[in-house]
C-alpha cells in the first residue's frame, strides 16, 4: 500500500512570485482570500518556509503578522498552522492544550500517542526552543496518575522501532498484560504501559493477536473494560494507531464533526499535521468507514474561506 499525503511540492514553484502574489492579496482595501488559500494549500511545508523567508526579504515584514492582521477566526488559525514547521506546529498545539484553565487531554493523546521516536524528539526540541520550557515537566505539572505516567513514557521516544517480530516474546507479553488486567481483581496499569510504550508496531500486532488467543476479548475490549477516563483513551489511541493509523485519524475527524458543533482545533490539527504524511489514506478510510466522504463532511460542517482552505488541504 502506498502511504501518501494530499499536499505535495508544487512542480513549478517560484517562492518570490508566491510572496508577491500574497502581498498583492493583502494590499489595499479588502483581501483576496482565494489567492491566499490557493498558495497555502497547494505548496509543501518546505516551500511555505521558503515563501516566508522571501516575503520578509522582499517586504521587510513577516508573512504571519500580515496574515494575522488580514484574516480572522478559524480561517486565520488554519492559515497560520500551514505556515508553521510540522514539529513547531505540534509543539504549539501541545502548549495550547495545557495553558490556561483546564487541559485538552484529547490533544495530548492525539499528538503524543501516535508519533514515531524521531517525531517525539523533534517536537520536544521545538517546544524547548519556542517556550524555553521542558515539555516533560509541563506535562507532569498538567496531568496526574496513570495518564501522566503513560504520557511521560511516550515522551521518552524509546519505542524499539526496528525490533523484529518474536512470537514467543509476544506470547509472554500477552500473558503478562492479561494477568495485569482481566486475570486479576484490579488492574496493574504499569504493565500495560511498559508493553504499549516500548514494543515495535509489528511486535504489538503480534501481542494483540496472542492476547485474543488467551482471552475471549480483543485487547481493545479489555482496555475498555479495565480502564476509564484519560488513561483508557490514551491506551486505546496507541492500540488503534497500531492496528490501523488511518482508521484512528478518520475516527477522530468524524468525532470532531458529528453531532452539534465542530471541534475546529481537532480538525485543523489533524488535517494540517497529516497533510503530507497519510491524509490521502485517511480520506479513503473515512469514506469506507462512514459511507460519506471527508469532503462532504467538511462541506456540511464548515463555511466560507475556512471551508475552502480545508477542502484544498484534503486535495479538492
From Swiss-Prot:
Belongs to the annexin family. Annexin repeats lie at residues 13-84, 85-156, 168-240, 244-315. It comes from Hydra vulgaris. Phosphorylated in vitro on serine(s) and threonine(s) by PKC. The keyword Ion transport does not apply. This is Annexin-B12. Keywords: Annexin, Calcium, Calcium/phospholipid-binding, Phosphoprotein, Repeat. The keyword Calcium applies. GO terms for molecular function: calcium ion binding; calcium-dependent phospholipid binding; phosphatidylserine binding. A pair of annexin repeats may form one binding site for calcium and phospholipid. The modification Phosphothreonine is found at residue 6. It holds the Pfam family Annexin. One of its GO terms (cellular component) is vesicle membrane. Coiled coil: none annotated. PROSITE patterns: ANNEXIN_1, ANNEXIN_2. It comes from the Eukaryota. Homohexamer. InterPro entries: Annexin (IPR001464), Annexin_repeat (IPR018502), Annexin_repeat_CS (IPR018252), Annexin_sf (IPR037104).
Amino acid at each position: 500500500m502506498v502511504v501518501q499525503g494530499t499536499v505535495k511540492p508544487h512542480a513549478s514553484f517560484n517562492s518570490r512570485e508566491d510572496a508577491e502574489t500574497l502581498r498583492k492579496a493583502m494590499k489595499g482595501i479588502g483581501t483576496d482570500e482565494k489567492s491566499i488559500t490557493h498558495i497555502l494549500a497547494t505548496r509543501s511545508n518546505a516551500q511555505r518556509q521558503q515563501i516566508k523567508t522571501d516575503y520578509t526579504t522582499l517586504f521587510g515584514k513577516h508573512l504571519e503578522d500580515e496574515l494575522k492582521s488580514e484574516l480572522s477566526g478559524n480561517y486565520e488559525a488554519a492559515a497560520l498552522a500551514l505556515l508553521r514547521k510540522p514539529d513547531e506546529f505540534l509543539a504549539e498545539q501541545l502548549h495550547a492544550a495545557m495553558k490556561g484553565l483546564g487541559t485538552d487531554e484529547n490533544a495530548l493523546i492525539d499528538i503524543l500517542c501516535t508519533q514515531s521516536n524521531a517525531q517525539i524528539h523533534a517536537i520536544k526540541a521545538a517546544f524547548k526552543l519556542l517556550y524555553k520550557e521542558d515539555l516533560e515537566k509541563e506535562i507532569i505539572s498538567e496531568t496526574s496518575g496513570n495518564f501522566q505516567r503513560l504520557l511521560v513514557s511516550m515522551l521518552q521516544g524509546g519505542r524499539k522501532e526496528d525490533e523484529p517480530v518474536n512470537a514467543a516474546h509476544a506470547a509472554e507479553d500477552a500473558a503478562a498484560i492479561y494477568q495485569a488486567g482481566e486475570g486479576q481483581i484490579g488492574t496493574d496499569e504499569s504493565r500495560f504501559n511498559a508493553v504499549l510504550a516500548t514494543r515495535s508496531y509489528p511486535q504489538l500486532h503480534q501481542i494483540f493477536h496472542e492476547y485474543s488467543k488467551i482471552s475471549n476479548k480483543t485487547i481493545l475490549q479489555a482496555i475498555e473494560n479495565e480502564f476509564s477516563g484519560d488513561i483508557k483513551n490514551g491506551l486505546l489511541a496507541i492500540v488503534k494507531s497500531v492496528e490501523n493509523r488511518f482508521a484512528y485519524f478518520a475516527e477522530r475527524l468524524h468525532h470532531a464533526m458529528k453531532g452539534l458543533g465542530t471541534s475546529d482545533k481537532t480538525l485543523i490539527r489533524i488535517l494540517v499535521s497529516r497533510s503530507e504524511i497519510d491524509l490521502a489514506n485517511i480520506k479513503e478510510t473515512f469514506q469506507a468507514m462512514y459511507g460519506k466522504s471527508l469532503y462532504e463532511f467538511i462541506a456540511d460542517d464548515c463555511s466560507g474561506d475556512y471551508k475552502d482552505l480545508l477542502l484544498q488541504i484534503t486535495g479538492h
